[in-house]
Amino acid sequence: MELPIEDVRVRKVLDSRGNFTVEADVYIPGGFGRTSAPAGASTGETEVIAFSKKGIDESIKFFETNVRRSIIGFNALDQKGFDALITDLDGSGNFSNLGGNLSTALSMSVAKAVSAHLGIPLYRYVGGINHSMPRPIGNVIGGGKHARNGTSIQEFLVSAQGKTFMESAYVNVLVHRKIGDILSEKMKDISIGVGDERAWSVNISDEEAFEVLNQAVNEVSSETKVKIYTGLDFAADSLYENGKYVYKHTVRSRDEQIDYAISINKDFGVYYIEDPMFDTDFEGFAEITKKIGDKAMIVGDDLYTTNPDRIRKGIELGSTNAVLIKVNQIGTLTKAQEAASLASSAGLKNVVSHRSGETTDDFLAHLSVAFSSTFVKTGTIGGERIAKLNELMRIEECLTS
């Protein structure tokens, strides 16, 4: 059986920050797929290139000139072959011609078109019968590159462990609201805003943020009788300068940063710890994982950039016990699925994640189920974040009915 690609259209659309990104439409007999790609602010050095160095228009021009003709007629059932083809047509090794965002939109749209033709959900087409619901984890206090005048640490996260996905997502929202109330009461003379991911942004220290977070979590957990995990995304690359980790009010050496990450779990009970070290320090990650990996999830994002080769190195060194998955870090569904499978085969958990510049596309909701992710990281509020959470509620309904 073959399902030849009949037509492909690409266009510019706006993301949640009001920046241009790309959207791709793929048409096959009896099927149609559309995907808009997100964009990150905190990006890893080894990610594929989002767009041509000459800009998004140049990436679209490259597609029209060098890619379109070759993919028309290609069998959409051959996802691996399609992804290999657009990788070869790009020719750069890092999608610096076509752009990783456009390759992501094309790759995901092919999968969506086939799932539509077959009349099955995307999560089932990608994951088969091996799928499970993730828990939502979302940013409630933000800083770093996601917010001006915020905390040094980029994300303070919560993950409610409710009986259902819906309950968990809503309890996360309640924590977000509670934090807003606490900040308004305690910080009457300080401006309070929201960052790219709709987390609260306020000019306070990381230690003050911990106090607010823990107060909100304890109060909401007591009110709802739901256990709530806390988490951090250090985004340590944005703190790293000349071998040191530079915070607003202190500077830490490599060893001090390792000790600090360990103390976060021991002193504050933080369960989820993402990117605590610079993205080349596999050994530093491993020291943290060795000390607290039995009590916490140590997650590699910028460390791995969804790259199977880097994940293999992390597995060999015992760097982390979890991997973050972002399709547009690696550029194709095939490579993202390989990354998730590689992690799982080595006993590592995976977390499918949004980007700070999101769209209302919900493909990552389906991938988090298809990849049997422990968590799906997609914020707590905001239309582009809620789109994923609502889709996961629909999927949960299908899986439990």
Curated annotation (Swiss-Prot):
Enzyme class: lyase
One of the protein's GO biological processes: glycolytic process
Pfam families the UniProt entry points to: Enolase_C, Enolase_N
Binding annotation for Mg(2+): D233, E274, D301
Active site (record annotation): E197 (proton donor), K326 (proton acceptor)
Residues that, per the record, bind (2R)-2-phosphoglycerate: Q154, K326, R355, S356, K377
Keyword set includes Secreted: yes
Any one Gene Ontology molecular-function term assigned to this protein's record: magnesium ion binding
Keywords of this entry: Cytoplasm, Glycolysis, Lyase, Magnesium, Metal-binding, Secreted
Lineage top rank: taxon: Archaea
Reported cofactor(s): Mg(2+)
Family to which this protein belongs: Belongs to the enolase family.
Xref: PANTHER family: ENOLASE
Name of this protein: Enolase
